[in-house]
Amino acid sequence: MENQYIYRVNASSTTLRSGIAVAEEIEPSITFSAPPEFQGEPGHWTPEHFFVAAVAGCFISTFSGIAHFSKFEFLSLELETEGTIAKDEGGWRFTQVTLRPRLKIAQEKDLDRAKRLLEKAERSCLVVRSLTTLVTMEPDIVLEEEFIERQKMGNSVPIS
C-alpha cells in the first residue's frame, strides 16, 4: 500500500535492564539500557533518549524537506531537544518535549519565512503528530553576520 509504511526493530535483552536494538539493513546496532536513575547501566542510550532522538531526527528531516520544496536556503540548522518525564497516577511518562532549533540564514529578508517554515516543520513532523505529549518550540533564527558576532561574544539571543 502506497500510503502506509512499516518500520521494524528487533530488540533483545543482553543483561538486566539492558539490551541491543537491530533494524534490518541498518548499521550499527544500538546497545541500550534503562537510565541510571532506574537502575540501568550508565553510558548507554536509553529508551528515553531514543524517544527524544526520534522527535529531533524527525524535526530536522521534516524541516529540511520543507525548505527544499519551498526553495528556502539556509546555512545551517542545529537542534537541541529536551524531553521531561514525570510520574503521574499511571506511572512515568513524557510530559513535555522542547525543541530549540538554531537556524542560521544569510539574509534578513528571510527571517519571517524562516520562522514560518520552522513552525510548519513542527506541525508536520510525523513523530510530533503522533504524540500526546506537549511539544513546544523555542526557535533561534540567526543571520550569518550576527552568528559570527555571537560566536565572538559567546552568547545567544533569540530573534522573534
Where are these predicted regions, by residue range?
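Extended beta-strand/beta-hairpin segments
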Residues: 1-53, 63-160
